[in-house]
UniProtKB/Swiss-Prot annotation:
Protein localization: Cytoplasm
Protein's name according to its UniProt entry: Elongation factor G
NCBIfam families listed in its UniProt record: EF-G, PRK12740.1-5, small_GTP
Gene Ontology cellular component list: cytoplasm
Residues bound to GTP: 19-26, 83-87, 137-140
Database matches in InterPro entries: EFG_II, EFG_III, EFG_III/V, EFG_IV, EFG_V, EFG_V-like, EFTu-like_2, G_TR_CS
Domain named tr-type G: residues: 10-290
Top-level taxon in the UniProt lineage: Bacteria
Protein biosynthesis among keywords: yes
Organism: Micrococcus luteus (strain ATCC 4698 / DSM 20030 / JCM 1464 / CCM 169 / CCUG 5858 / IAM 1056 / NBRC 3333 / NCIMB 9278 / NCTC 2665 / VKM Ac-2230) (Micrococcus lysodeikticus)
Keywords, in A-Z order: Cytoplasm, Elongation factor, GTP-binding, Nucleotide-binding, Protein biosynthesis
UniProt key word Nucleotide-binding: yes
GO terms for biological process, alphabetical: ribosome disassembly
Lineage: Bacteria, Bacillati, Actinomycetota, Actinomycetes, Micrococcales
Length: 704
């Protein structure tokens, strides 16, 4: 690397490139790396050569799955770029990169405008107050419309765009942009694909006559927005004085850093036009690590005690681990954002989140998947670390003498799960290693060992998410596994009280026999309150010796593991032992255990047993025009609509829907709403299954 890490933090930018799938985000990143001199040959996503798409599946699918961190230099500034995925199933990657960014470039497709995933990512960026500039890409595409895209930024995102450039020409005739600050035209001559300099040089010309009027109109809007940033500028503006270029740039920077407005640029990354002015804008308008002020955290033992760390080399060390990746040679790489202090390789740090000490191995600045070793890490930068054993995504690393916990990230609960089992005995060990590593990388995968079936279940954020999991397992860890269909966890319970069940267990087999007699009553408990089981002993006068009573209880619990209807675990039952009898020689703990178990099975059959299913609280955010379709669809899934509310530009529908009806929902929702609606789903409660559905479940369990 030609330059070392810049120590002047005013000249550092930690940015993300965020966009909808296919808006040209990876191509834009590639061009940035090309113009900043990191790459000598351009990588194109559609031939699988892009630098940041470095995992095998990404090359195949042409979508960016993991955010690789890349460092480059422009105009004497260092830019650390995090490439983020644009697919809805990978929102956790986006969340975790936004948490550690200072600013972002939002890339939009000039033909499609603001698309659903851009909406989702934009709202996530709002959550972390990330300042953004916008790049309207693909201006060379048929049907590209810059003004339409700017309009969708207002209508769909409720954001305030600051138009900084106008396109010159459109589609095949797109040749450059009008810069509204200098009021000059930047033109990339010739066919950029055949141009030897690959669009690296552009000519500065006068604005074409047909655009002069439009350019003046948009410049006035820009100057007016800037004038509002201070009384001094407002006065100057009202008196008809021209604002200087420096004043306009300072005003735009202030609006951007405060996330009050978003400068909009345009170009075609694929045709190498418009990328350099956008890089100039990253340097001119996006914040440096010092702009956000000291980083806030809390004391290790008390969340109420707020702690601060200055963004400087002198402050105590603090950093956030925001991504774990498995590297073919080094093993586990932990990506960290250093917020304060400095650290040399070999030093010891405290993982404050887990309360464990870690030793730092090698330190790198990353360029996609090439590494540049460094001797120390300093505040304000992003690095990859080797040698951390217990650190996972969202953990805080800090100076052991000055512990602090930085705000972590919130990860959603998985909405879908599949059973997975190794094809051979030899795959068993590989499978557990693979699962362990993949879960450390992505905390939205959850692993659960199903005690009822003995299978390992993997939960994730969607079907594509689980596909990629299985795919990586096969490819990176060479595990062959069978993957089952998504499953629902049903339960069984009873509806009415049974006053008295008598059961005698008697066996005579030469020598000592077995004898136990019990009398029990059973009644339903409130499952909504989470009451699973209760046992009461009401026997008087020693009719059942004290040492045998726990055995009756244990026998009932044995029987509850498999319900009488379809074999699902039972919940919500209270059992009372009323009476019984024993035999001095033939009674034993085992005899009473069997009696309890059999009495329970007999009693449950008389107590109107039913099947319960998990109900999910589903929230759908949809543009108003699809509201009817969304509600109709939820009703057809046995959903109960709970409420409908307004949010920025969308309607929010809340409903309770059985989990079994939600499989495949994401695909249906996307097709019904042109992909513009998003939903989230969390477990709510268990509820009784309608008779027709229960019959089906029982039949299925008997048929297996």
């Amino acid at each position: 690397m030609a330059q070392d890490v810049l120590t002047d933090l005013h000249k550092v930018r930690n940015i993300g490139i965020m966009a909808h799938i296919d808006a040209g985000k990876t191509t834009t990143t590639e061009r940035i790396l090309f113009y900043t001199g990191v790459n000598h040959k351009l990588g194109e996503t559609h031939d699988g050569g892009a630098t940041t798409d470095w995992m095998e599946q990404e090359k195949e699918r042409g979508i960016t799955i993991t955010s690789a961190a890349v460092t480059c230099f422009w105009n004497d500034h260092q830019i650390n770029i995090i490439d983020t995925p644009g697919h809805v199933d990978f929102t956790v990657e986006v969340e975790r990169s936004l948490r550690v960014l200072d600013g972002a470039v939002a890339v939009f497709d000039g033909k499609e405008g603001v698309e659903p995933q851009s909406e989702t990512v934009w709202r996530q960026a709002d959550k972390y107050d990330v300042p953004r500039i916008c790049f309207v890409n693909k201006m060379d595409k048929l049907g590209a419309d810059f003004y339409f895209t700017v309009d969708t930024i207002v209508k769909r995102l409720g954001a305030r765009p600051l138009v900084m450039q106008l396109p010159i020409g459109a589609e095949n005739d797109f040749v450059g942009v009008v810069d509204l600050i200098s009021m000059k035209a930047f033109v990339w001559p010739g066919d950029a694909k055949g141009d030897v300099t690959m669009g690296a040089s552009y000519e500065i010309r006068e604005i074409p006559a047909e655009l002069q009027e439009k350019a003046e109109e948009y410049r006035n809007e820009l100057v007016e927005a800037v004038a509002e940033t201070s009384e001094e500028l407002m006065e100057k503006y009202l008196e008809g004085e021209e604002l200087t270029v420096e004043e306009i740039q300072a005003g735009v920077r202030q609006l951007t850093v405060n996330a009050e407005a978003y400068p909009v640029f345009c170009g075609s990354a694929f045709k190498n036009r418009g990328v350099q002015p956008m890089l100039d804008a990253v340097v001119a308008y996006l914040p440096n690590p010092l702009d956000a002020g000291p980083v806030k955290g809390h004391a290790v033992n008390d969340e109420e005690v707020v702690l601060e760390r200055e963004v400087s080399k002198e402050a105590p060390f603090s950093a956030l681990a925001f991504k774990i990746a498995t590297h073919p040679f080094f093993g586990t790489l932990t990506f960290i954002r250093v917020y304060s202090g400095r650290l040399e390789s070999g030093a010891q740090v405290l993982n404050a989140t887990k309360g464990k000490k870690e030793r730092i191995g090698k330190l790198f600045q990353m360029h996609a998947n090439k590494e540049n070793p460094v001797d120390e890490v300093v505040a304000g930068h992003i690095y990859a670390v080797i040698g951390l054993k217990d650190t996972t995504t969202g953990d805080t690393l800090c100076d052991p003498a000055n512990p602090i916990i930085l705000e972590s990230m919130t990860f959603p609960e998985p909405v879908i799960s599949v059973a997975i089992e190794p094809k051979t005995k030899g795959d068993q060990e590989k499978l557990s290693t693979a699962i362990q590593k993949l879960v450390a990388e992505d905390p939205t995968f959850r692993v659960n060992l199903n005690e009822e079936t003995g299978q390992t279940e993997i939960g994730g954020m969607g079907e594509l998410h689980l596909d990629v999991f299985v795919d990586r397992m096969k490819r990176e860890f060479k595990v062959e596994a069978n993957v089952g269909k998504p499953q629902v966890a049903y339960r069984e319970t009873i509806k009415r009280k049974v006053d008295k069940v008598d059961y005698t267990h008697k066996k005579q087999t030469g020598g000592s026999g077995q004898f136990a007699k019990v009398q029990l009553s059973f009644e339903p408990l409130d499952t909504a309150e989470g009451e699973v089981y209760e046992f009461e002993n009401a026997v008087t006068g020693g009719r059942v010796p004290r040492e045998y009573i726990p055995s009756v209880d244990a026998g009932i619990q044995d029987a509850m593991k498999f319900g009488v209807l379809a074999g699902y675990p039972m919940v919500g039952v209270k059992a009372t032992l009323l009476d019984g009898a024993y035999h001095d020689v033939d009674s034993s703990e085992m005899a009473f255990r069997i009696a309890g178990s059999q009495a329970f099975k007999e009693g449950v059959r008389k107590a109107t047993p039913i099947i319960l299913e998990p109900l999910m609280a589903v929230e759908v955010r949809t543009p108003e025009e699809f509201m009817g379709d969304v509600i109709g669809d939820l009703n057809s899934r046995r959903g109960q609509i709970q409420s409908m509310e307004d949010a920025t530009g969308v309607k929010v529908v809340n409903a309770l829907v059985p989990l079994s009806e939600m499989f495949g929902y994401i695909g249906d929702l996307r097709s019904k709403t042109q992909g513009r609606a998003v939903y989230s789903m969390t477990f709510h409660s268990y509820a009784e299954v309608p008779k027709a559905v229960a019959d089906e479940i029982v039949q299925k369990s008997q048929g297996e």
